[in-house]
């Protein structure tokens, strides 16, 4: 996570505005009716998503986690009413708590296929019945994953994911898909990028899970 610690401030300057995704975050919020709901923000970065969620639902009790110390420091400064800690998103079952919402906005591109599927499984274990899971990733053939070079020369391995195996993993864990969206834009070097957003509800009735992608 040295790359993210190094570029934390630059990342905040570039990505603090989450306007492109606000409509999907609104769907997430709309499906959490309980007041003071416990929300987990995985790979929270500088707290950009947490900040938006709290602007819509100041009652949310949000815990944000990130592996980068500098990201966590920025997130806490940006969201003094939320809680943040340095933690690996692949270890969320260690929290030993139930959440009514889990936000995974910018994590999956840094997880392998196997890790992404495991994260969905882990999320199912710590979500309450009726809890909401938000997933977002860059969508493409998984085989196209590889090392990407940032404008400052830093290199990072980026994973593309496919909707098919993510949705299959969600259904296996008792999730019902309630919203699927795709957003297209141009990446930093001009290449076309498709962001996939999936919102699902933890639903333990297997007869009620046959929702098309």
Label each PLM-derived region with a short phrase:
Residues 138-157:
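Short, glycine-/aromatic-enriched active-site segment of Class I SAM-dependent methyltransferases
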Residues 158-173:
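Short alpha-helix
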Residues 40-42, 46-91:
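Class I SAM-dependent methyltransferase SAM/SAH-binding core
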Residues 117-129:
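A short glycine-rich, Lys/Arg-flanked "PGG" loop and its adjoining helix->strand segment in the class I
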Residues 186-213:
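Core SAM-dependent methyltransferase catalytic element
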Residues 130-137:
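Conserved beta-strand signature within the Rossmann-like core of class I S-adenosyl-L-methionine
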Residues 1-33, 141:
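Conserved class I S-adenosyl-L-methionine
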Residues 103-104:
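A conserved beta-strand element that flanks and buttresses the S-adenosyl-L-methionine
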């Amino acid at each position: 996570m040295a790359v993210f610690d190094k570029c934390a401030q630059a990342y905040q300057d570039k990505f603090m505005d989450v306007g492109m995704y606000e409509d999907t975050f609104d769907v997430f919020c709309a499906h959490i009716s309980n007041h003071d709901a416990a929300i987990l923000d995985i790979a929270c970065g500088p707290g950009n998503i947490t900040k938006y969620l709290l602007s819509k639902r100041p009652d949310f009790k949000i815990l944000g986690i990130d592996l980068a110390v500098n990201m966590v420091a920025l997130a806490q400064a940006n969201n003094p009413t939320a809680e943040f800690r340095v933690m690996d998103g692949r270890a969320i079952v260690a929290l030993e708590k139930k959440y009514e919402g889990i936000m995974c906005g910018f994590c999956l591109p840094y997880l392998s296929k196997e890790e992404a599927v495991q994260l969905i499984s882990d999320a199912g274990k710590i979500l309450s019945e009726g809890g909401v899971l938000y997933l977002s990733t860059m969508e493409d053939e998984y085989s196209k994953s590889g090392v990407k070079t940032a404008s400052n020369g830093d290199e990072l391995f980026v994973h593309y994911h496919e909707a098919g195996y993510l949705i299959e993993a969600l259904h296996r864990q008792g999730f019902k898909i309630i919203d699927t969206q795709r957003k297209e834009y141009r990446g930093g070097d001009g290449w076309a990028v498709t962001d996939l957003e999936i919102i699902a509800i933890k639903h333990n009735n297997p007869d009620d899970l046959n929702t098309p992608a």
